[in-house]
């Protein structure tokens, strides 16, 4: 491919429908504004529900799946069922049990991580305000 044909190829690509979907180049400041973690850049306080919503949902779903697994496992060992149903229940019960326990533990571990992030964010905001106080004088 020669240098003369390269710009023509680019012109054809710019007219394609995919070129309309491409974003224009952004500066660093506009990238910060459109970043996913926009809450880092805003100073509005968030409620506890907004902060801990995801771990609470994960723990609730994990607890429900764990309870379902316990019930199925208990039924598999207490009921007199056919061999086929019994073998299915003995496989599915512990599967739900372990999945629920895993989700419950993930939610429980997530809470201290969020608390640590909140403390770090508070310290960061304090240091930022202290820095701006001394720099404006």
Swiss-Prot record:
GO biological process terms, semicolon-separated: behavioral response to pain; regulation of sensory perception of pain; response to heat
GO cellular component, one term: plasma membrane
Function: Regulatory subunit of TRPV1, a molecular sensor of noxious heat and capsaicin. Positively regulates TRPV1 channel activity via phosphatidylinositol 4,5-bisphosphate (PIP2). Binds various phosphoinositide, including phosphatidylinositol 4,5-bisphosphate (PIP2), but not phosphatidylinositol (PI).
Biological source species: Homo sapiens (Human)
Subunit details: Interacts with TRPV1.
Transmembrane intervals: 56-76, 94-114
Coiled-coil residue spans: none
Compartment(s) of residence: Membrane
Any GO MF annotation of the entry: transmembrane transporter binding
Classification via Pfam families: PIRT (PF15099)
Membrane topology, record value: Multi-pass membrane protein
Protein name: Phosphoinositide-interacting protein
Major location category of this protein: membrane
Keywords: Membrane, Transmembrane, Transmembrane helix
Gene it is expressed from: PIRT
């Amino acid at each position: 491919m020669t240098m003369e044909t390269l710009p023509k190829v680019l012109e054809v690509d710019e007219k394609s429908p995919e070129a309309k979907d491409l974003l224009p180049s952004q500066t660093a400041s506009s990238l910060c504004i459109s970043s996913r973690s926009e809450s880092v850049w805003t100073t509005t306080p968030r409620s506890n529900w907004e902060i801990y919503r995801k771990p609470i949902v994960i723990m609730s779903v994990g607890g429900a799946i764990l309870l379902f697994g316990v019930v199925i496992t208990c039924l598999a060992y207490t009921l007199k069922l056919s061999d086929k149903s019994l073998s299915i229940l003995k496989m599915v019960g512990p599967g739900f049990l372990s999945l629920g326990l895993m989700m419950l533990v993930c939610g429980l571990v997530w809470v201290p991580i969020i608390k640590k992030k909140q403390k770090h964010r508070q310290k960061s905001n304090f240091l930022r305000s202290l820095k701006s106080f001394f720099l404006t004088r």
